[in-house]
């Protein structure tokens, strides 16, 4: 399915440039044309992958309901909401939470993207969908692996906290009109990356204050436990050598989405009385 509120329903195709990390760690550059098939009213699908920018989830679901489009929902995007709120969004739809390790940007009829070889997927016991094995079979057929975190909602919050540390540090020094250059500046500076590590730690305190036991996510959070100056140097080397990660950083140019992520974490931190001085300073420096 293809849905985006800003797109023209008469659009027939998209040109796609993809750095594909499926089979090679450095990625392969691929180009193709994606044929757009707009879902018809009263149609039914095995799965509906819902991957939209912040604030569009409810709107997308209303369009699906209005057109009586049915199928198992796969939420494939960031959100700072609770599981109860997600359940309210879904309503009568059965759903599962997942998150792609992919990214990119859309300009006119062209998609420039990066794809890794795995994604995050809610465990079968928490998903409550009858076609879980069909979904994993679909992923396998596309040569995609998956990881199952302790809790998918909590994992997304953690992911947003990490993003907040990185993007708020990048954005504090300039206008978000040019996020690509801000990302490059950050990745080329070990001192700025060290600062980002410190902000990530503050942002994770906000997640913890929401009731998340961070000890259940030791593997994901281990890189942020080592001394910040060492982590900053390691991250600089990683960005220099890992083209997939480097490109996904430079392609992330949705400034409203970036601001939504940072503002959500920052505002919750203030509401819960969490001390986040570096993040607060970063937020004051961000200019849309």
Identify the residue ranges that each predicted region occupies.
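NAD(P)-dependent Rossmann-like dehydrogenase/reductase catalytic/cofactor-binding core
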Residues: 197, 201-288
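Glycine-rich phosphate-binding loop and adjoining beta1-alpha1-beta2 segment
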Residues: 2-29
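Rossmann-like NAD(P)(H) cofactor-binding subdomain of soluble oxidoreductases
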Residues: 26-112
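Inter-helical turn/loop segments and adjacent helix faces that build the functional surface
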Residues: 146-147, 182-186, 269-275
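Rossmann-fold dinucleotide-binding core
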Residues: 80-165
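Helix-loop-beta segment of a Rossmann-like dinucleotide-binding subdomain
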Residues: 110-126, 173-186, 241-252
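Active-site-proximal catalytic alpha-helix in oxidoreductases
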Residues: 153-184, 190-204
């Amino acid at each position: 399915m293809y849905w985006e509120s800003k797109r023209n329903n008469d659009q027939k195709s998209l040109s796609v440039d993809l750095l594909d990390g499926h089979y090679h760690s450095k990625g392969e550059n691929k180009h193709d044309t994606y044929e757009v098939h707009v879902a018809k009213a009263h149609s039914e699908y095995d799965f509906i992958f819902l991957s939209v920018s912040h604030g569009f989830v409810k709107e997308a679901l209303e369009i699906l309901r209005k057109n009586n489009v049915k199928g198992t929902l796969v939420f494939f995007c960031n959100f700072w909401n609770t599981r109860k709120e997600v359940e309210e969004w879904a309503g009568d739809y059965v759903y599962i939470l997942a998150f792609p390790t992919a990214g990119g940007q859309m300009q006119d009829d062209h998609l420039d993207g990066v794809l890794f070889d795995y994604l995050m997927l809610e465990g079968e016991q928490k998903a409550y969908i009858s076609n879980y094995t069909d979904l994993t079979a679909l992923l396998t057929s596309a040569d995609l692996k998956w990881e199952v975190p302790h809790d998918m909602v909590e994992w997304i919050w953690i992911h947003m906290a990490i993003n907040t540390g990185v993007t708020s540090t990048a954005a504090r020094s300039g206008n978000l009109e040019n996020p690509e250059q801000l990302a490059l500046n950050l990745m080329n500076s070990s001192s700025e990356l060290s600062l980002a590590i410190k902000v990530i730690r503050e942002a994770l305190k906000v997640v913890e204050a929401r009731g998340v036991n961070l000890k259940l996510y030791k593997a994901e959070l281990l890189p942020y436990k080592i001394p910040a100056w060492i982590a900053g140097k390691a991250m600089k080397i990683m960005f220099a050598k890992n083209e997939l990660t480097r490109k996904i950083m430079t392609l992330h140019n949705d400034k409203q989405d970036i601001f939504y992520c940072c503002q959500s974490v920052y505002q919750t931190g203030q509401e819960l009385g969490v001390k986040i001085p570096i993040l607060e300073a970063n937020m004051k420096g961000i200019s849309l």
